[in-house]
């Protein structure tokens, strides 16, 4: 049986992490990414009928770090594995190889992205379309995920739970995290190459043109949002109802970790999304961006739900190393490579 190099932990996994410091960002990012890759490989194990300790390639992606996959999330239509729950259990005799245990997770809920194989591609693309149309919350995959996360958070609290996902799976992790964060629990969230549904303005080389387009977009988006809000306000006044709390601002104390590559047009717009807020503050019209940043122009015109990709605060990590092509820029393996250069910034919505 032909084995893909990307599935083989001994060839492409983070083998250098023989001891873990849970306070180290590179270690945390690498472990979270490896667990997500474990879900990808679990699905490919299923499709290729690689079963048992001799053939299955997925277990080592988690067991190398002393995690065990205790539950698989299975799609109700095609039986594909789209996510799972890992439990961390470090053997007592190995406790000396791990530092900062207070920052370790007890459970990690991980989600894969699209698998371009015949057994799962149609169902995955269906969910990709749900992301585009801001309808991921209506899917049975989300119902399975959010119920599982709620149960775990109720049992052990939010601080012991991590969410992690790549591409489509990053959208699922962010949506699940948003939903839980609104209940007052702030789980760690590792979103690798999360889709940002917007024109790829970040690709424009001329900074003045790029900034001008962003300002114009912000003004239009903020104007439409305020007009919509005014209409709703008058409607509520007619019924003597109080204005609802701002759901976007309620998430401002939650800092999901976003990992983006400028060469990946599906997620690179996050760089401009957060930097543009600072620029708008500098020129004195930050109030416009505080309204615009909560809304998607396309979403408002289509009348959709709140977009998954719009986040008030974040810890944004950018891979500054060049990628040879889109496939590499969008891949999960880049996030545990030692030779890549990363830049991390914290953005807080105020």
Curated annotation (Swiss-Prot):
Q: Name one GO biological process term.
A: lipid catabolic process
- Under which EC number(s) is this enzyme classified? 3.1.1.-
What keywords is this UniProt entry annotated with? Hydrolase, Lipid degradation, Lipid metabolism
Which pairs are disulfide-linked?
none
| Keyword Lipid metabolism attributed | yes
Listed GO MF terms: hydrolase activity
* Domain of life according to the entry: Eukaryota
**Does this entry carry the keyword Hydrolase?**
yes
Report the family membership: Belongs to the 'GDSL' lipolytic enzyme family.
Q: What is this protein called?
A: GDSL esterase/lipase At4g10955
From what organism does this protein derive? Arabidopsis thaliana (Mouse-ear cress)
């Amino acid at each position: 049986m032909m084995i893909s190099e990307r599935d083989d932990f001994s060839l492409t996994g983070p083998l250098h992490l023989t001891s873990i410091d849970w306070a180290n960002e590179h270690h945390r990012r690498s472990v979270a990414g490896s667990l997500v890759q474990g879900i990808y490989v679990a699905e490919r194990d299923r499709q290729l009928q690689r079963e048992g300790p001799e053939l299955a390639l997925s277990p080592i992606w988690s067991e190398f770090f002393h995690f065990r996959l205790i539950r698989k999330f299975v799609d109700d239509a095609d039986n594909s594995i789209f996510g799972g729950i890992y439990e961390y259990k470090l053997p007592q005799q190995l406790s000396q190889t791990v530092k900062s245990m207070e920052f370790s997770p007890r459970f990690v809920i991980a989600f894969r992205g699209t698998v371009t194989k015949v057994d799962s591609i149609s169902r995955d693309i269906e969910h990709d379309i749900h992301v585009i149309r801001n309808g991921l919350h209506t899917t049975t995959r989300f119902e399975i995920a959010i119920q599982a996360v709620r149960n775990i958070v109720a049992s052990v609290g939010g601080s012991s739970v991590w969410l992690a996902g790549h591409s489509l799976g990053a959208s699922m992790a962010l949506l699940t995290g948003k939903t839980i964060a609104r209940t007052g629990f702030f789980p760690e969230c590792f979103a690798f190459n999360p889709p940002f549904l917007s024109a790829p303005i970040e690709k424009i080389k001329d900074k003045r043109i790029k900034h001008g387009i962003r300002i114009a977009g912000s003004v239009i988006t903020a104007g439409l949002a305020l007009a919509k809000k005014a209409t709703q306000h008058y409607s509520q006044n007619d019924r003597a109802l109080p204005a609802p709390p701002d759901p976007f601002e309620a998430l401002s104390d939650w800092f999901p970790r976003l990992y983006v590559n400028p060469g990946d047009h599906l997620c690179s717009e996050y760089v401009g999304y957060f930097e543009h807020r600072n620029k708008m503050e500098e020129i004195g019209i930050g109030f416009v961006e505080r309204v615009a940043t909560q809304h998607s122009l396309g979403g408002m015109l289509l009348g959709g739900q709140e977009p998954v990709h719009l986040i008030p605060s974040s810890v944004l990590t950018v891979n500054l190393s060049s990628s040879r092509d889109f496939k590499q820029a969008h891949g999960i393996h880049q996030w545990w490579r030692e030779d890549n250069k990363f830049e991390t910034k914290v953005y807080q919505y105020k």
